A protein has these predicted regions:
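A conserved beta-strand element that flanks and buttresses the S-adenosyl-L-methionine
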Residues: 73
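A short glycine-rich, Lys/Arg-flanked "PGG" loop and its adjoining helix->strand segment in the class I
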Residues: 65, 87-99
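Short glycine-rich, flexible loops that bind phosphorylated cofactors or substrates
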Residues: 80-81, 112
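Short catalytic micro-motifs in class I SAM-dependent methyltransferases
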Residues: 76-77
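Class I (Rossmann-like) S-adenosyl-L-methionine-dependent methyltransferase catalytic domain
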Residues: 1-5, 10-61, 88, 102-191
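A short, conserved alpha-helix within the catalytic core of class I
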Residues: 53, 81-92
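Local beta-strand N-terminus motif with an aromatic residue
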Residues: 69-70
Length: 191
């Protein structure tokens, strides 16, 4: 765990939301002295992480105005979402980003290399195809979901986003650790 002092720099703001009440409460407590930090719990349904959630992920509207952020970050979010939910969250990221704004998101991207490594038993997650999905557990797909690389451009273009640089491949499927466990996608809002 590393500590930085970026929270003492007061230009701008940091706004976050999550479906994990305990995580939000921790952030609210530890960042309370810094008025430019704001965290809120959202009661969004997720079969794995928040099965009693009252708001559908496909209908959730981020609690922020249009064009309000320079940067958005979503770590280990799309790895637990169904395709229609991913589409909505990408649309929402696009909506809240300013023109030219960027986002860093993580995902499990399924391509030929990942499929070969999973088939060879090198992956930390035993993904398998179930219908249109590539999941760890067919009974609770939201436990871990991979996005087909061939579908990624469609998701992004439909949301008005594009990749801003190459995908930084993660080590989840047995690749050497280079950048991260999950695949890193740097996105940019289209003008």
């Amino acid at each position: 765990h590393t500590h930085t002092h970026t929270h003492t720099h007061t230009a701008g703001s940091y706004d976050g939301f999550d479906i994990d009440k305990n995580g939000v409460a921790w952030c609210q407590k530890h960042y309370a002295p810094y008025s430019h930090f704001s965290f809120q719990y959202v009661d969004v349904f997720n079969k794995y992480y928040n099965p009693k959630g009252q708001i559908k992920s496909t209908e959730f509207r981020f609690p922020y105005p249009d064009n309000s952020f320079d940067f958005a970050f979503a770590t280990s979010v799309f790895t637990h979402m169904l395709p229609d939910e991913i589409a909505n969250y990408l649309n929402e990221i696009q909506r809240v980003l300013k023109v030219g704004g960027t986002a860093l998101v993580t995902a499990f991207i399924w391509n030929d290399e990942a499929a070969e490594l999973v088939a060879a038993g090198k992956s930390t997650i035993a993904f398998a195809t179930h219908g249109d999905l590539i999941v760890k557990d067919k009974n609770i797909p939201e436990d871990a979901i991979a996005i087909r690389h061939s579908d990624l451009d469609n998701y992004l273009s439909a949301a008005g986003l594009t990749l801003d640089g190459p995908i930084r491949w993660g080590s989840w499927c047995g690749r050497p650790e280079e950048h991260s466990y999950q695949d890193l996608l740097h996105l940019k809002k289209l003008d």
